[in-house]
Amino acid sequence: MRLVTPGRLLALGAVLLAVAFALYVIPSNEYIFLPDKAHPVAPLVTVQGGHDPVHGGVYFVDVVVRKATILEKLFGGLHKGADLYPASAVNPPGVNDQQLRRIDLQDMSHSQQVAAAVALRAAGKHVVLRSIGAQIDEVAPGLPAVGKLEPDDVIVAINGKRVQSKNDVFTAMSSHKIGDTVSFTVRRGKQTFVERMRTVSSGGKSPHAIVGVVVETAVDIHLPLHVSIDAGGVGGPSAGLAFAIQVLAELEPDVLHGHKIAATGEIEPNGAVEPIGGVKQKTIGALIDEIAPGFPAVGKL
């Protein structure tokens, strides 16, 4: 029988500590969604001729998304309000984390432009705001669109049917089976051309036909006054509704009625609010700061 000496106990403790540390820092193959705090919007938005509301305020709520550590994957209850998702539910097919970050920042910039235009229109200002197609944000490596389509190209038709928004692309692609050949009419600068591509599988639990592009709605926007929005390093389009409400509140003082509200949701050029993701995390983030969540299931500004 071997004696358990202090030295052996110390060595065993060091090994267990090293294992625990490794489990805590080594990323797994899944992503974790965590609540984030509510962010005041007023310091981020400046409207020419506008004024911040004296009472109340608008806040946007975000979701912290990162690779889950092995420990977080094994014990999902380590963080309040956390959810785990496979990579296929977070990254578009063929898109890596660096590309996804770039897409998120582009989506944020786009959402700011649309939010300003929608809000000014709601305030009765003359605004030019038109959806003119689906702009390509990213082309995924190794998929059919490589060498044929490029970032900033605008898809204006699919199989001859006009495309005015990203949702038109999703609808058109959903009607095709994996392996179908699809015709894309594309505008690149002043040139318009047609590319035909055979679709491939997206993979994952719900495989569908793709060609390997990430798109957003292309818009033509002209505003009658200057609006500046600076979200720092926050990405994604879901702060659009909060930005729009803030712009409107700076021009129309009675919008908030003195309340503090947390708003989230991607806003479309027609004023519609897209379905909201991460509702659980965003609700927790708002309630932690004692701010009333104002998340429309379906809405329009």
Task: List where the protein language model places each region.
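Membrane-entry signal-anchor segments at the cytosolic-membrane interface
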Residues: M1-A14, R102-Q106
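Terminal peptide-recognition signature
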Residues: L120, A145, D152-I155, F184, ...
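Conserved PDZ fold ligand-binding element
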Residues: A145-D168, K282-T283, E290-L301
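PDZ-domain C-terminal substructure recognizer with occasional recognition of PDZ-binding tails
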Residues: F170-V214
